[in-house]
């Protein structure tokens, strides 16, 4: 199958690549089916793209690229909804807000996207803690 994206050109994918989000994601609750693909020539960023709306693609990254000790605790309901039986089946990703000013690029560590890679089910959750920021700087200033 083909997806003609606004910013990344034509992307080929198979049905097995599609991740289902029963609740959609905040701001796009009506969109339920997404694929993930790498940003060309970049090992840190991925694209989280709707296959239902060719204009909706979000840059994402692993939180462990930013915070080595990143840790979340899923609630029982979330574990059940995502059908997670082993933590190895859970992939954690976070959305990135881009800017032409590199110092203003941020990562939302408070609302991770959790994906059961075995079942191809996902959900964006909101962490009820001040430990992580919604706008965490991607690049910290060196002291």
UniProtKB/Swiss-Prot annotation:
Q: What is its main location?
A: cytoplasm
Question: What GO biological process terms does the UniProt entry carry, in alphabetical order?
Answer: bacterial-type flagellum assembly; regulation of translation
InterPro entries referenced in this protein's UniProt entry, alphabetically: Flagellar_assembly_factor_FliW, Flagellar_assmbl_FliW_dom_sf
Q: Which keywords describe this protein according to UniProt? A: Bacterial flagellum biogenesis, Chaperone, Cytoplasm, Translation regulation
Q: Name one Pfam family in it.
A: FliW
Keyword Coiled coil applies: no
**Subunit text:** Interacts with translational regulator CsrA and flagellin(s).
Function recorded in the entry: Acts as an anti-CsrA protein, binds CsrA and prevents it from repressing translation of its target genes, one of which is flagellin. Binds to flagellin and participates in the assembly of the flagellum.
Record family assignment: Belongs to the FliW family.
The protein, known as: Flagellar assembly factor FliW
Q: Which organism is it from?
A: Clostridium botulinum (strain Langeland / NCTC 10281 / Type F)
UniProt gene name:
fliW
